[in-house]
Curated annotation (Swiss-Prot):
Pfam families: BMP2K_C. Disulfide bonds: none annotated. Keywords: Acetylation, Phosphoprotein. The modification Phosphotyrosine is found at residue 293. Residues 336-348 have a biased composition (Low complexity). This is Uncharacterized protein FLJ45252. The keyword Disulfide bond does not apply.
Length: 355
């Protein structure tokens, strides 16, 4: 039993269901109970009787046998039944609500500010050494301020200085070709003057020829044309002194004088290399160890110092003959005892190993 004014059941929604169950059970028990005509077995009847005894042992049935009046009195009022009112939020002043909404708006604006304020405020990366796409095109190129040369300034200068060899100390190919042409013309000029002097025509004055040749020498007074200028000066002098002789002949004669000076050493070289020029150089001490050794190739000991005697004058023959030995070096090597070179070395000899 419960006190009046308070609901007996915690959940008021289940009250009607319990009422229907109580009515059915009370109607069932008010009748004769399970009749013999019913289809229940005896075991089921015994079970129902036991259940009735268990219910009656307490002396009363507080939940099942209550009257409708008690049920109606125990029911909560309709206001309380429909009082499943949702939890009402605490009252908030309109000022606080405005501040909360303003804070939310600021959060959304914080994400959109970088995109909207980028044009008005300077970008951090624009100030940094990194280049951003927002930098206007009016700014100058970074490399124009640096020691590097910009592409715009390099473009017009490339065709002018495309060839590296055009710079000093190199010269153009055309200039070299022109120099070769001028060399040929300068060589033909003295020949023509020589022919004019031989035929008896009016020869050019010597002073004019010298002026022409000196101008040519002044233009090409480089290291590569020193020999040519010397030849021209010799030809001019020869044309002045000997009108009947061509300057080429004088050049050849001047060359002949220089060749006469070199005849002396050349004759000595021929005397030295003459008899031994056809044979390859082979040291006599190592000749017997060679694969192509034959005793016929060995010169006689008397024939070796002949070449030396030709070079030296007859007065020094005896002094040198006394100092130079006539015997060959190969004969000296044969005189040495045929000892095993490994016997003298720190390696043990084969003879010592044998018992």
């Amino acid at each position: 039993m419960g006190t009046k004014g308070l609901p007996l059941y915690p959940d008021p929604s289940r009250v009607p269901g319990t009422k229907t169950q109580n009515n059915l059970e009370s109607d069932y028990l008010a009748r004769d109970g399970p009749s013999s005509n019913s289809s229940f077995h005896s075991s089921e009847e015994e079970g129902t009787d036991l259940e009735g005894d268990m219910l009656d042992c307490s002396g009363s049935r507080p939940l099942l046998m209550e009257s409708e009046e008690e049920d109606e009195s125990c029911r909560p009022p309709p206001g309380k039944l429909g009082g499943a009112v949702p939890f009402a939020p605490p009252e908030v002043s309109p000022e606080q609500a405005k501040t909360v909404q303003g804070g939310r708006k600021n959060q959304f604006q914080a994400f959109t500010q970088p995109a909207t304020d980028g044009l008005s405020e300077p970008d951090v990366f624009a100030i940094a050494p990194f280049r951003s796409s927002r930098v206007p095109n009016d700014d100058m190129d970074i490399f124009s301020k640096a020691p590097f040369v910009s592409k715009s300034s390099m473009a017009p200068s490339q065709p002018e200085e495309s060839d590296v060899f055009l710079r000093a100390p190199f010269t153009k190919k055309k200039s070299m070709e022109e120099l070769t042409v001028i060399q040929c013309t300068s060589q033909e000029l003295p020949a023509q003057t020589g022919l004019l002097s031989q035929t008896g025509d009016v020869p050019l004055p010597a002073g004019r020829e010298r002026a022409v040749y000196t101008s040519v020498q002044a233009q090409y007074s480089t290291a590569g044309f020193v020999q040519q200028s010397n030849l021209l000066s010799h030809s001019v002098q020869a044309a002045d002194h000997l009108d009947s002789i061509s300057p080429r002949g004088s050049c050849l004669e001047s060359g002949g004088h220089s060749n006469d000076r070199n005849k002396g050493p050349q004759l000595q070289k021929e005397a030295v290399s003459g008899p031994m020029a056809g044979k390859p150089f082979r040291p006599q001490s190592l000749s017997k160890y060679s694969r192509h050794y034959s005793p016929e190739d060995e010169p006689s000991p008397e024939a070796q110092p002949i070449a030396a005697y030709k070079i030296v004058s007859q007065t020094n023959k005896q002094s040198i003959a006394g100092s130079v030995s006539i015997t060959s070096l190969s004969s000296r090597t044969t005189e040495l005892p045929a000892a095993d070179p490994f016997a003298l070395a720190p390696f043990p000899s084969k003879s010592g190993k044998k018992p």
